[in-house]
């Protein structure tokens, strides 16, 4: 029997909440290292990698037992944060914010294979292109994005964006990069080939996370300061003009953070840092249906189908 779960990281109590989406309740709580912040689940669903930022460690969790089975450490971990996996799941990319480095980790051995300095300020997140060939790394303090080639495992470019970029994702069609700039409350829509900024949009206060629905129809942006989610219709057609447009701003809890969709794209789930809960958003009605209580200061969130 298939079950759907959320894995929610509770930063201020050093735990993970396992939420059963059928029961809409926490079914298990697991202790982690200090300050679990960001998470990624392997493509086969067997493992999760949890960046514990203030603990300077990456916890490896077995998703069958929900036990921490390994801890990855390195002397140059300094607020390890953004995590992402290659398309085959064989390599984990980790951004270490204050040491301004990217670590490439073999997921079969959980050994660090390569350390790459970005030479940029506060390298914070990891976002892969849909084809898995490119990694985009927002540098909050340098107001730019670092581009890495996955095949060569080398940095190939940096390009400027707005102030304080954090939430970054590539549209499923591979043609546009969306960047949420938290310091001036804007969204940039950028051509992946030319890196030209095609559109600039004002969104909510302090946008920090950005995800696309599986079909690419919507982008959701978590606005931390204004406690809401900007719903962007990626191809709104007005009198023959197709453009991305904010069609709704959904109130959620205080300090909206991590967002994830279910596999079908029918629901999105938003971790509310300061109300200690997760908002369930119905993507057909574009309304918050309910909230699920979790631990203290939830932020990183992942969807798991077993």
Briefly describe each language-model feature range.
Residues 1-306:
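Predominantly soluble domains enriched in secretory-pathway, periplasmic, or organellar proteins
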